[in-house]
Amino acid sequence: MRFSTASRHAVAAAYLIRLLSITFGQNVIVVDASVLAVALGDYGTDGQHARERLAGETLVAPELVDLEVVSVWRRHVAAKLMSARRAASAVADLADLPLRRSSHQSFLHRIWELRHVVTPYDAAYIALAEALDVVLVTADARLSRASGVHCEIEAIDGASGG
């Protein structure tokens, strides 16, 4: 029996959610919208690579992450890069993902300090990773080259988020 790409992705996403639920409390990483958009919305090798990197980690992100991820998928649907059905499934997976969301309010000063280097959205992820002293995982290679940050930024090779 052959499974459709959508079925394989649904199984992979469910596996990631289950695996993260079981291992919640292990290694903590901050994840940005680009890597989550790929992990939950991409059925190909980029998505698989992102899911493998996130598996077994405790995921943390600023609470704006949900809006940013949904915005990525909205653009992909509008550009016909993703079906609305697939995006709706990915939104459901995002809602079920054991992701600790953190308010960005306490990081506003650091976000402002980073204004010349990155957008305020990206700065929120950086500030959170700095505060937790953990790695920030992204699918945005440009972000991984940002200067003046005080955390490790790991870009997932081959992933093209955003």
Q: Which residues fall in each region the model found?
A:
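Short, well-structured N-terminal submotif of metal-dependent ribonuclease cores
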Residues: 2-64, 76-85, 159-162
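Active-site neighborhoods of divalent-metal-dependent phosphate/nucleic-acid chemistry enzymes
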Residues: 3-8, 12-19, 97-142
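Active-site-proximal, substrate-binding regions of enzyme catalytic domains
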Residues: 70-98, 102, 110-111
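Short acidic-hydrophobic, aromatic-tinged amphipathic segments that line or gate anion-handling sites
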Residues: 101-104, 153-158
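Short loop/helix-cap segments at secondary-structure boundaries that form the rim of catalytic
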Residues: 144-150
